Amino acid sequence: MARMSRRVFTLSALSVLAATGGGAAACGAAAPRSGTAARAAAGRPAPEAGRASRAPAEMRGVWLATVTNRDWPSRPGLTAAAQRGELTAHLDKAVRDRLNTVILQVRPTADALWPSPYEPWSECLTGRQGRNPGWDPLGTAVREAHARGLELHAWFNPYRIALHADPTRLTASHPARRHPDWVVPYDGRLHYNPGLPEVRAFVQRAMLDAVARYPVDAVHFDDYFYPYPVAGQTFDDADAYDRHGGAFGSRAAWRRDNIDRLVREMAAGIERVRPGTRFGISPFGVWRNAATDPRGSDTQAGVQTYDDLHADTRKWVRENWIDYVVPQLYWHIGYADADYAELAAWWAETARGTRTHLYLGEALYKAGAAEEPSAWQDPVELSRHLTLAAAHPQVRGHVFFAGKEVAADPIGAMARVVADHYERSAKPPR
């Protein structure tokens, strides 16, 4: 989840990680904790053992990103019929791969893939923000997914406004133009200020409108809260901090409280508007390094969600604020600075004893990519991830980034996952 897409931005974050992690391996290629993990680390997946250890219900998801037309629609300006056809093709491929959940990005940049009274139609549909595409993409996606036995999770980006820094390029009626005091330019992009209570209230109204209209199975956030840090740049929220941050010892603590409030309030709003609808978040995979906090993972990541994105993802899991978490574990087994095996174990321990379901985010987009190391040239790498994760009973499934790679599967990595682990259909956990 183009750098502006969440997963490709995460790839940029990984380049920071690689540049700053340096030194000794975070956990080396950590000694396997079980026979199953040992086989996985040695490149010998044991799919039957993996399947046998799984619960009858299992998350098997795929993200379908719309920002910059990453996965769907393939380009802006297609006819409504062509867009529908591409959408249903993605759903049909999910069914063939025995997946059970599609996570569709429906509010990528303070816009909408449904007829919202709050925000304009997304430009990913027509090429022009605010132009009616002539159909209801979210309503259609929910109906067509359910007709195929798939869950449809609506994926929202709360605070990202635009992938450029020019407010005049937004529609004249855009809330960000009507309320310029809500907007913070940063890193060549426009963001809503999470420190303003009126902003937090507005983005929740905009998102909950979709929940009220459609029987989505879940609301989904990704890793974007405060923006990823950029050297030499400052996210200018000093005025908001002066007005609202007096009770906090630092601006960082105030920022974390702002995001905590969004998460708690959104969970309550979802339950109020459509009881039983779940709420999940997919954060960057490292909460904190152990060198920063002894409760953290044995990693040397260049990005830590607690410190850099002001997202206390561990707290949300431990305090059961969300129904599920999907940490983006976009590294291979044995990667020195952020070993998949170490992080899978850390998240499993974090979820232990909570009501928060743990699913692991998988970097299918790296499989066969020329710029990736040799581990990602092996079509068995992702299958090894699932085998290793099966040793942790807290792991209740996986989500793959993203739809384009599920469809194309350039080196057969997804086909190998399906053959090794998805021989039979499974329902998602509830």
Task: Kindly label every feature range from the protein language model.
Residues 65, 69-81, 159-209, 307-308:
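Active-site-adjacent "subsite" loops/lids of carbohydrate-active enzymes
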Residues 114-126, 160-186, 224-246, 291-301:
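Aromatic- and acidic-residue-enriched segments that line the glycan-binding/catalytic groove
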Residues 278-326, 331, 335-339, 343:
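Substrate-binding cleft/loops of secretory-pathway carbohydrate-active enzymes
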